Amino acid sequence: ERLKATPANLNGLLDALGERQAVLVGNDWGASIAWQAAQVRPDRFRAVAALGVPMMGRAPMAPSRLFPQNEQAWFYTHYFSAPGVAEAEFERDIPATLRKIYFCASGAMGPRDGGTPNPFGMVPRGGGLLDSLTDPTALPPWLGAADLERSVQAYTRSGFRGGLNYYRNLDGNWQAQAAFAGLRIEVPALYLVGEYDTGLAIPGMRQIIDAMPLLAPDLRGSQVIARAGHWLQQEAPDAVNAALVAFLRAL
């Protein structure tokens, strides 16, 4: 149950470093882990900042039942959960896979509406996630060719299965969340999200963000970074750093 193990690992890291407390900053999956760690060990993690993924309560049902699917299409989490399916698609042409996902989840795609290509939306049955995504003619300014090549080499060595296995344990993590029911984030918190983040296209996500003070009563800010997408700290590093530094100085 990674939901329990990873915060425990962070606690162990503090012990190994000889530190009594730390401030956590997490992005995407790391944001979920940072929220969880601050929730269960506020004595060790005295503040938390999260990028992209807001603090949210436990869903009323398991993700496999919650996320949409029908005869024509299924939500990307279902597609990722099918063993071997996404791996086969993504590993067929790793450079193209990364170009498409990085570009189409970025702020370059503009506002997230029903017609915006989204790597993290509905996937046609019998088709692939990459089919509808734009392959850019040039890399966005925040993604250098050398950086992309390092990612290509890393995924060529490892494949995509390790990351995709996260989605295959969503129901397990949901079950583990029951142990933390009723716990709030009692330490100071900060939330940052890109104006064009793909997650904002998920139904109900904006309402979840608006309701965060109920779960994190010491939320010091919920900031939307203009024109940035899912890769927030890469697309808008100056804005992210400024927000983090201001948050840390006020603790």
Region locations from a protein language model:
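Flexible "cap/lid" subdomain of the alpha/beta-hydrolase fold that forms the substrate-access gate
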Residues: 1-25, 29-220
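Catalytic active-site module of serine/aspartate enzymes centered on a nucleophile-bearing elbow/loop
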Residues: 217-251
